[in-house]
């Protein structure tokens, strides 16, 4: 019974820590929306799934392509200890890239910055030409795919694993995600 009590106290402590967390601040105004791409290349906001998405800012639409750029990015978990100092890099639309390096080289940090889990001290990170600080965090994170070092698959089919982030995904949406 004593072990049970210790486990319960440990669980309660984690719950209280979670409850004390400050809500994440999100001042982004640019959102992700499904679009129809017309024959002339223009975009029209769509009601349902179309397979194409765009960044919506006020009345303008910018097609989601996946162009990610770091320009002179400076970041450190503390002001005194910079992890990245003036880094510039880019990933072209559709390009698959891998960050390879020793432990502590900044691979996971770069992924965390793209997702805005942390804010950079200076420089810019753009996504399809839009400063990511202007994009709503939920929409930014929905638009990204990543495989981190410790990859875990769940029981079930490959489709079930892909559906993990969107349980109501249709087979068509899964096929689109795989292409």
Stretches with model-predicted labels:
Residues 21-24, 174:
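Hydrophobic patch in the ABC ATPase nucleotide-binding domain
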Residues 17, 24, 163:
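Conserved E/DxxT/N motif and adjacent residues on the DHp alpha2 helix
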Residues 11, 21, 137, 141:
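ATP/adenylate-binding site constellation spanning eukaryotic-like Ser/Thr protein kinases
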Residues 28, 35-179:
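ABC-type nucleotide-binding domain
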Residues 1-20:
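Cytosolic ends of transmembrane helices, especially the final helix of ABC transmembrane type-1 domains
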Residues 20-21, 149:
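Residues at helix-coil transition
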């Amino acid at each position: 019974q004593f072990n049970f009590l210790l486990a319960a106290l440990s669980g309660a402590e984690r719950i209280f820590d979670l409850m004390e967390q400050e809500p994440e601040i999100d001042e982004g105004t640019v959102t992700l929306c499904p679009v129809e791409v017309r024959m002339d290349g223009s975009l029209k906001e769509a009601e349902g799934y179309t397979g194409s998405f765009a960044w919506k800012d006020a009345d303008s639409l910018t097609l989601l392509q996946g162009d990610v750029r770091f320009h002179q990015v400076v970041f450190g978990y503390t002001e005194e200890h910079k992890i990245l100092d003036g880094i510039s890099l880019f990933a072209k639309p559709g390009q698959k890239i891998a960050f390879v390096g020793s432990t502590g080289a900044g691979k996971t940090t770069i992924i965390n910055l793209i997702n805005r889990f942390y804010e950079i001290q200076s420089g810019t990170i753009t996504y399809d030409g839009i400063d990511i600080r202007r994009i709503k965090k939920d929409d930014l994170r929905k638009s990204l795919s990543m495989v981190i070092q410790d990859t875990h698959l769940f029981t079930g089919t490959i489709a079930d694993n892909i559906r993990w982030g969107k349980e109501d995904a249709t087979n068509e949406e899964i096929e689109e995600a795989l292409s």
